[in-house]
Amino acid sequence: MTELKPLLIELGTEELPVNALPNLSRAFFEGVLAGLEKRGIVVDHGEAKSLSTPRRLAVLLTAVAVEQPKQYRELFGPYLNTAFDTEGKPTKALEGFAAKCGVNWRTLERIRDTKGERFVHRVVVPGERTDALLPGILTEAIAGMPIPKPMRWGAHEYLFARPVHWLVMLLGQDVVEAEIMGVKAGRISRGHRFLYDKPVSLSDPQNYIDVLQAAYVLVDPAARRARIVAEIEAVARQVGGVARITEDNVAQVVNLVEWPSAVLCSFERVFLEVPQEALIQTMEVNQKFFPVLDSLGKLTEKFIGIANIESNDVAEVAKGYERVIRPRFSDAKFFFNEDLKQGLKAMGERLRTVTYHAKLGTLADKVARVLVLAEAIAPQIGVDPLLARRVALLSKNDLQSRMVNEFPELQGIAGHHYALISGELPEVAMAIEDAYRPRFSGDEIARSPLGKVLGLAERLDTLACGFAVGMKPTGNKDPFGLRRNALGLARTMIESRFDLDLKVLLDQASDWVAFATTIEQERHAQESVKQSKKEAAVKHSVPQVSDEKSARIEELYDFIVERLRGYYADKGIPTTHFNAVAELKPVSLYDFHRRLDAIGRFAALPEAEALAVANKRIRNILRKAEIKIPASVDATLFDQPAESGLLVALEGVITDTRSALDCKNYVSVLTCLARLRPPIDEFFDKVMVNDENLMLRANRLALLQRLGEYLCCVAAIEHLSN
């Protein structure tokens, strides 16, 4: 039995980049494991730990074999027909092989393969010791790390994210001799930079976490996270509030500290006059602080900072944090007051001076297009078109505010506040902010009907614009954010149960974009031909229908639907089900969703697989047909009971499901289709479709064509076939 020992590798550095630390730690851990496994060294993965702090990367394995297993090798020699001469004496080939193996040829074994019998020498090579292999393993692991900006440090030749100051390598209680990046391995680590700034001697890997904790270092990120969250919640409770704790903020702070300690801070209440989103943005994104809210979710004047020390003078630490935040809050208040002086209307007037795209005009032009689309969508979902017009008219005004210029993440949010202050209806103000939802992956869609209308109109215009000017996404490039806009559009339609004709909306959006590009061309032409804008508008007021436009609408539709593939995959919907519905190209995405739901239920029926196979067979037969197929079935040409039986069953199902299909009750339709399995099976068992009699053949093909069309009335069910 191979002896197992714990292994510790710790690489000590200057403070590593906070955003890169998780990936560096993961890659370091995986690289060490991969190196051990590559060399056949046994590792117990049960208690394996990837550990890190801003100043160190560590791998802790509880059980690693002290040596490789024995290596069994086979060296293949010559075949018998070349190993001996005609007199049966060994040839130079055999003697040379034996000499290479260091044995007498008579001791060699023989094996037989497809070419005949040959000599083989089997040897057992002792495994190398793990401590001898570890330097190479560590070097490989470091070389494979995703270092964002590798640099040389001092007089050293190595490239790394930060200077390396120490290296601990212990296999059991023994130091592994190695020199990596100019540092010799040992058993000396370092404690906290301020609370325990002295060497820490490690005698055994199994004591690593506890010894460092005694030196004021929580080396396990999970332990630091737990302490941070617990302390923040406790401090917030002390002042009767609730801390706003986001995963992104916690993840950042975890990688900034080795010994976290929560500190309660405060700011002047006058800053609460500023929209709270701006203050929260400043605290979380710029300073990594945690705002404290009241029971209603409103921001209070309290916030919590996480210090990397346990201070004897917490009040002084708090003053430092407050001193840092005050200038930023003062700036936010200044921007807010300046915006109030100019007002929302003045901001909107400046949209004419901002180019949206060289071929698409200004932001004011975009607002005009969105306004028309919003007016068209609103009555279809029960929203007042006048309100839709108003919210569209105001939707981009805040882009010209000082607040959004300083805090781009507040677009829409700032507009909401300024609209309320300007006396707009609450639903109009809310819709300005709401329309931006979903802002990120996993975010909720817009909550208000008016916000949904604006969000749909905005995204339709953006998608049509992007495709019209050739800004389609390629690889990881998506300058217009078309993928995100497409998914936001689709999610809003589906999750709001809006049964809207997507192709009609895309057609309308494309018309207005075509009009915009034409006007822009005329604007440029005015410089040379002095043609008036009014003449250009009259000349081009009716967009021309073209094959190119139709193709673009189809391309846009396919692009949007393709974004749904991942959306449904995340919900566990099989790709085969998605493909079955996508082939029919339903014009309504909510209708797409209902068909997909029905297919999921249909697939669970025992008849589903057989009908899917039958439909695939029908398609193959029709595709290979070499004669013209009649438009209708002639029952007088039937000469087999199975033919008439199938037609009667099909007509019965069509009659029974007509109402359900009109009401889009797809589950009921597909359940009825299951009744067709017996007559379909009998038809294929008893009837020769490609009969020599061409009239019979054509009539049977017509029957199959009608059957195939109805089997696919909800989805192309052949995709369900295994």
Curated annotation (Swiss-Prot):
GO CC annotation terms, alphabetical: cytosol
- Which Gene Ontology molecular-function terms are recorded? arginine-tRNA ligase activity; ATP binding; glycine-tRNA ligase activity
Any idea which UniProt keywords this protein has?
Aminoacyl-tRNA synthetase, ATP-binding, Cytoplasm, Ligase, Nucleotide-binding, Protein biosynthesis
Report the subcellular localization. Cytoplasm
The enzyme's E.C. designation: 6.1.1.14
- Taxonomically, the superkingdom here is Bacteria
Signal peptide per UniProt: none
Q: Which reaction does it catalyse?
A: tRNA(Gly) + glycine + ATP = glycyl-tRNA(Gly) + AMP + diphosphate
Q: Does the keyword Protein biosynthesis apply?
A: yes
SUPFAM superfamilies assigned to the protein according to its UniProt record, in alphabetical order: HD-domain/PDEase-like
One of the Pfam families matching this protein, by short name: tRNA_synt_2f
Q: Name one GO biological process term.
A: glycyl-tRNA aminoacylation
The record describes its quaternary structure and partners as:
Tetramer of two alpha and two beta subunits.
Of which family is this protein a member? Belongs to the class-II aminoacyl-tRNA synthetase family.
Q: What is this protein called?
A: Glycine--tRNA ligase beta subunit
State the encoding gene: glyS
